[in-house]
Amino acid sequence: MPELPEVETVCRGLNRLTLEQTIGGGEVLLDRSLAYPVSVEDFQKQITGCRLVGWQRRGKYLLGELRSNQAPGPAGWLGCHLRMTGQLLWTERDQQRPRHTRVVLHFEGGWELRFVDTRTFGKVWLLPGDRPWAEVMTGLGQLGPEPFGADFTAEYLYEKLKSSRRPLKNALLDQRLVAGLGNIYADEVLFFCGFHPTMASNQVSLQDCELIHQQIQATLTAAIEAGGTSFSDYRQVTGINGNYGGMAQVYGREGEPCRHCGTVIAKIKLGGRSAHFCPQCQPKLER
């Protein structure tokens, strides 16, 4: 699943390529990819004649602000969640569409924004301008702070973790704790901290949380600078891969030697998700 660095990379690409261009129409090729409005006809009618004036990211959600060419003021928001296999691709109209194209926006000048999704878990919303986002995209209201936000601090982490017995890896995946962190970067953060993924959350000290906070920000920054990770379906808006995969320390490297000590990287199941770690660099400690 695309995580914060991948979604942020897509957001920056959309801000670079799609702004101030009029949407000439839209197609919904798979009805269930459209979460709101329910009617495809309403979606097509409402989005035609609008232009995108800016994109932002919240957790793993994308939100594009729409303005109408016919009336002043906000016209609404275009929302998207890529889920497991979603892609947003900016491409010329005469290029062949991928097989799993689900929603298409037609722009003036012969360009299209295509929502491509193999497994069909991703969603697109057209949000009214006069309603709070979270009323329609209910998942937004459940998100914790952004990793780079002022309210995400080591002290906040410590208060949230100190009374929980959940494995630390599982806690970091909880979007209510911190928005946007997922399986790839939780593994990487724990490696850089030297913490075993099964370590109980209530075993961390405030000093540990300072390290976790630091490594979350550092790891996500490095991944954003690399354009994200392309292990499977993720692509940037121009269709190219992200480059962080070759920099990964543990994720996706089970059976390979640790880049720091040479110990074979291990993989376990933890709460229905995989966890990759170095048994030497991340020993399981009894505290």
From Swiss-Prot:
Cofactor: Zn(2+)
Enzyme Commission identifier(s): 3.2.2.23, 4.2.99.18
Keyword Ribosomal protein recorded: no
UniProt binding sites for DNA: H100, R119
An individual GO BP term: base-excision repair
Molecular function as annotated in GO: 8-oxo-7,8-dihydroguanine DNA N-glycosylase activity; class I DNA-(apurinic or apyrimidinic site) endonuclease activity; damaged DNA binding; DNA-(apurinic or apyrimidinic site) endonuclease activity; zinc ion binding
Catalysed reactions listed for this entry: Hydrolysis of DNA containing ring-opened 7-methylguanine residues, releasing 2,6-diamino-4-hydroxy-5-(N-methyl)formamidopyrimidine; 2'-deoxyribonucleotide-(2'-deoxyribose 5'-phosphate)-2'-deoxyribonucleotide-DNA = a 3'-end 2'-deoxyribonucleotide-(2,3-dehydro-2,3-deoxyribose 5'-phosphate)-DNA + a 5'-end 5'-phospho-2'-deoxyribonucleoside-DNA + H(+)
Entry's cofactor comment: Binds 1 zinc ion per subunit.
Keyword DNA repair in record: yes
UniProtKB keywords: DNA damage, DNA repair, DNA-binding, Glycosidase, Hydrolase, Lyase, Metal-binding, Multifunctional enzyme, Zinc, Zinc-finger
InterPro entries per record: DNA_glyclase/AP_lyase_DNA-bd, DNA_glyclase_Znf_dom_DNA_BS, Formamido-pyr_DNA_Glyclase, FPG_cat, MutM-like_N-ter, Ribosomal_uS13-like_H2TH, Znf_DNA_glyclase/AP_lyase, Znf_FPG/IleRS
Zinc finger (FPG-type): 249-283
PROSITE patterns: FPG_CAT, ZF_FPG_1, ZF_FPG_2
Catalytic center residues: P2 (schiff-base intermediate with dna), E3 (proton donor), K60 (proton donor), R273 (proton donor)
Family per record: Belongs to the FPG family.
Subunit structure: Monomer.
Function of the molecule: Involved in base excision repair of DNA damaged by oxidation or by mutagenic agents. Acts as a DNA glycosylase that recognizes and removes damaged bases. Has a preference for oxidized purines, such as 7,8-dihydro-8-oxoguanine (8-oxoG). Has AP (apurinic/apyrimidinic) lyase activity and introduces nicks in the DNA strand. Cleaves the DNA backbone by beta-delta elimination to generate a single-strand break at the site of the removed base with both 3'- and 5'-phosphates.
NCBIfam families noted in UniProt: fpg (TIGR00577), PRK01103.1 (NF002211), PRK13945.1 (NF010551)
The protein, known as: Formamidopyrimidine-DNA glycosylase
Organism annotation: Synechocystis sp. (strain ATCC 27184 / PCC 6803 / Kazusa)
Gene that this sequence comes from: mutM
